[in-house]
Amino acid sequence: MIIYRDCISQDEMFSDIYKITEVANGLCLEVEGKMVSRKEGEIDDALIGGNASAEGPEGDGTEATVITGVDIVMNHHLQETSFTKESYKKYIKDYMKSIKARLEETKPERVKPFMTGAAEQVKHILGNFKNYQFFVGENMNPDGMVGLLDFREDGVTPYMIFFKDGLEMEKC
């Protein structure tokens, strides 16, 4: 499995269990999720590869709290945050500077394509600003990456957008 981490906060943003597509000429990764419902405190056996206990039926007849949300957000403990258009412009300007500095050190050949593509992508984001929900990593680092959540035209299928150059891949 590959875990994609925010290169600034080191927070886990998503993994390769989802359908991942490069968009915006390879500048961003679009990660498709789905809406799920879970009992609070319950861990999906599919995520850990485990089996239900053979010791007998679970539960003691109490009602469980059911939480419904996007699997990417729930599985990776992403935290919702909010922005006005102006506050997002300020955030994204500072974030782009951080990524540019990182690229200058690690991948200088990516600086120009990143800066050109990022300007276009930010225009697109601002043009569709009202459609997005914003999520940061578990540690809620204000300098870290903000993932954008939107829904496909069907209104049911959620997807998130992340800047590819702001991510590190870690094999587990």
UniProtKB/Swiss-Prot annotation:
Protein name: Translationally-controlled tumor protein homolog
Gene3D superfamilies associated with the record: Metal Binding Protein, Guanine Nucleotide Exchange Factor, Chain A
Location(s), subcellular: Secreted
Coiled-coil regions listed: none
Stretch forming the signal peptide: none
Keyword Secreted: yes
Pfam families registered for this protein in UniProt: TCTP
The TCTP domain, residue ranges: 1-172
Recorded GO MF terms: calcium ion binding
Record-stated family: Belongs to the TCTP family.
More details: Secretion of this protein from cells may proceed via an ER/Golgi-independent pathway, probably mediated by secreted vesicles called exosomes.
InterPro entries xref list: Mss4-like_sf, Mss4/transl-control_tumour, TCTP, Translation_control_tumour_CS, Translational_control_tumour_p
PROSITE patterns membership: TCTP_1 (PS01002), TCTP_2 (PS01003), TCTP_3 (PS51797)
Tissue-wise expression: Expressed by the venom gland.
Annotated keywords: Secreted
GO CC, one annotated term: cytoplasm
The protein's role, per its UniProt record: Venom protein that causes edema, enhances vascular permeability and is likely related to the inflammatory activity of the venom.
Organism of this sequence: Crotalus adamanteus (Eastern diamondback rattlesnake)
